[in-house]
A protein has these predicted regions:
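Short acidic/His/Gly/Ser-rich catalytic and metal-binding motifs that mark active-site loops
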Residues: 167-171
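Short pre-catalytic strand/loop immediately N-terminal to key active-site residues, enriched for Gly-Thr
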Residues: 174-183
Length: 183
């Protein structure tokens, strides 16, 4: 009720406060891996109707590693940047209220060609990944946070999304929390 327009004061954008960054800053002391930009050029098209009708959750994973090109394509498909408008907004492969794109993508890598197992962060603006941690116990902590679902330890990569709420609330005030949950 309190986030209805009638109750909302001026947003930080309306107050003239600076916009939050489009992406969390990269720690220059951490290793960064360039991702292939061509993605899966040979991947056949799939009709949307067929994709919806054929969709199944399968938790039986093959042991062959995910290629770096496959990982790059999945990252681009889920948070990829298609266009940057100055420092103001990005056009991505996914929608976001007001092009605010509050989500940050993290990866728990288990079995990807050329990558050491560990925690990474997707740097969407430059289509790279930043290595954050290679502690082998981290995967078990993430599985525990996912209600001890053991497939979290057996899959090639786990996508983890966090949000920077201020990217939304800067523009929309308290109502930004609603938009964040819709995104």
């Amino acid at each position: 009720e309190r986030t209805k327009y009638a109750y909302i004061g001026r947003s930080d954008q309306q107050k003239g406060l600076p916009q939050p960054p489009l992406e969390l800053p990269h720690d220059l002391s951490r290793p960064v891996i360039e991702l292939p930009r061509d993605g899966l050029q040979g991947t056949p098209s799939l009709d949307l109707r067929d994709a919806i009708l054929q969709r199944r959750s399968i938790r039986s994973f093959v042991r062959e590693p995910l290629s770096l090109a496959e990982l790059a394509w999945l990252l681009f498909a889920t948070q990829g940047v298609q266009h940057v408008e100055g420092r103001h907004w990005t056009m991505r492969t996914v929608p976001s209220a007001g092009a605010r794109h509050a989500f940050e993508t993290y990866l728990m890598i288990h079995n990807v060609e050329g990558l050491e197992p560990g925690l990474y962060r997707y740097l969407a603006l430059s289509h790279r990944i930043e290595q954050l941690d290679t502690d082998p116990t981290l995967a078990h902590a993430i599985a525990a946070a996912c209600f001890d679902q053991q497939f979290i330890l057996r899959c090639n990569a786990v996508f983890l999304w966090t949000a920077v709420p201020y990217r939304m609330t800067w523009r929309y005030g308290e109502r930004g929390y609603r938009d964040l949950h819709l995104d």
